[in-house]
Amino acid sequence: MEKDFTERSTKGQRKLANGVVENIESKLKNHLDNNNVINKSVNYEDVMCSNVKLSVHDDEYDIKNIKKDVCNLSKLSEERLSNNISLKDNNKVVKNPEIDTKTARQQYKKRLNSTQSTMNIEGNINNEKDDIIEDYDDGLIRNMDYEMSIVKNKRNNNNNNNNNNNNNNNNNNNNNNNNNNNNNNNNSNNVDNRKRNKNEECYDESYCISDNLDEITSYRNKLSLYNKLRMCFNYFGPGWIVAIAYLDPGNLCSNLNVGLIRSPDPTLEKDYSGYYLLWIMVYGHMLGFIFQVLSMRLGHVTGLDLASLCSKEFDRTTSTIIYVLVQIAIWGAHIQAIIGTFIALNLIFGISVKVAIFYTLFEAIIYSFLENKSLGLLENVLSFLVGILAVSFFVNVFMTPINFKELAISILYPRIPKGKEIDALALLGSIISAHIFYLHTNLTAKKKSVICNDLSLRRYNTLGTIESGGSLFLSCLTNCIIVLTFAEVNLKSFERRDQYNLFTAYEVMRKSFGKISMYIWSFGLLSSGNNSSFMCEYASKSVVEGFLNKKINTFVRVFTFRLMLFSLLYMFLTLNKYTLDQLTNFINVIQVLLLPMATIPLYRFSIHENVLGEFRLKKFPKFAVFLIIIAIIISNVLLTFLDFVHKETSLITIFFLVIFSFLYFGFIIYFFNIPIKKNYIQRN
């Protein structure tokens, strides 16, 4: 056993290995001591459930091993019943022969749900008061394979005893003693073989660097670059899922519209109007990074998501209003995802749009299966699709002649072309959406179970910041590439920019960069639609469970929402498929107007001592985030007003606009003044 752990360099890791061996050997010695195996009333259910709670393996290991062992409990129950029948004559009865398999499976599901979609760094040791173990060695990781070997050894002993009782009634006691002694010797040999056999070692050291957080902090500078990178990659997950929201079909539609902006002046030798709104793209991702870090910190410190905090703190009416508005934002993003998916299928395979929309129902079945199977598997699928998306659009960089001087000017010098205020607003709405902050807090809150003190909390916050920064940098780069690709398209004088949308964007790519670029665009759009669809389902689940405080069957929830959205889209398709582009832009505007429904409560909880304690925003950061939220709210209303000024609007439209503005600002002012009374901080 010690030989298997020679690759570990720190003292704490050697102690971890030695402690596991000593723990298991002592248990084997106690459980397999001569004739006491049968007389002891060991409850197998307790053994299994305790190990489910204390398992430190990742979700993949749980699925392959623990689930299989828990499902075999019924077989152990039958053997115990048969042992009782055969041992009645000797007054030796195993107590509690019926194993409560239902309870054991519930414990397994509870353990799996509490830590799924998170990678293990410190070891998933339960932090609840009932599970705190005083002794250091007892607090070490329990090895599931060794525990199951105990169960199997007991079962073999019982079977051997039964055979001896049936065949040698006169010498029953002697045979039992001999068999037990032989089995004990075999068991000790098996333990030695397990120590020597590296292939049977179930502890996966790739998911754990050290169990001693103080030691990690003390020797931080001595950790190799490889170990530091491994720590980062073991954490990664939530930030990359959230980054999908920055690369959905709504973003692609806004990027297309912004990149195809052209100046009305026909005398320009080279028109760079498509570059003008890149500053919104870059600064929008910076704002997104700030709020993603706040979301991540809120989940790590409290162990609750933003929806649960709103439900617990605000009254039912306010919570219901927020829930409805956030759910509208999710449905809007989901509609955009479905649009992007069946447009891509139509472009790649030539399938009719009305037939391609049924693919979304099949996609719902896939999502339901992945969520019920393992959220770790779902994360892997989403990461693969994100990779396809990034590669597809990065290839366009080598086909596009970019003017880097104009690019730098457009980022550093904010400007909005005349009459393009609604495009600027839609671009901001496509970048930052309300539901992504609810989703991010939900994902990071699940890591609370493996955060055991303030040192690990700070480390997790650092890793979360690195992950959010890296994922949003990749997202910003990809979106800018899409804008620049369409900004460099040479439109003819007789062609209008309004002629191109998600349906016809492939024609622009084909004319300017060749046929292969058309397929690159289509595959990127398909990957974006699938990614965004899965992400919206995940966000919907977290919002429903957080606000309503109840779990809804995945299959029922997914199909109900999909059928509703399917009916709405089919109605649009029966009218004219090109209205979908206008629908996508309208949804982006709605997204940015609903953004305060996430940023305001996130800000309120992030500055309150009862929620984040010493990790709350203080002084300058607190004031800076407040100004950002106010600037977003004012820009929303101002850009909407300017867009109406450039158009001919009726008195009824102006009347509704004024009423909406009063209601909008009134609710926001009320939202800012709701007191936070409860204490959510969990001190480690």
Swiss-Prot record:
UniProt-annotated location(s): Vacuole membrane
Main localization (coarse): membrane
GO biological process: iron ion transmembrane transport; manganese ion transport
Factors inducing expression: Expression is modulated by the levels of iron ions in the environment.
Consequences of knocking out this gene: Repeated attempts to generate a knockout failed. Conditional knockdown results in rapid parasite death. Impaired apicoplast biogenesis. Impaired mitochondrial polarization.
Transmembrane feature ranges: 229-247, 276-299, 320-345, 351-370, 382-404, 424-445, 466-487, 516-534, 555-573, 585-603, 623-645, 651-673
Catalysed reactions listed for this entry: Fe(2+)(in) = Fe(2+)(out)
Assigned protein family: Belongs to the NRAMP (TC 2.A.55) family.
Name of the protein in its database record: Divalent metal transporter 1
The species this protein was found in: Plasmodium falciparum (isolate 3D7)
Taxonomic lineage from the root: Eukaryota, Sar, Alveolata, Apicomplexa, Aconoidasida
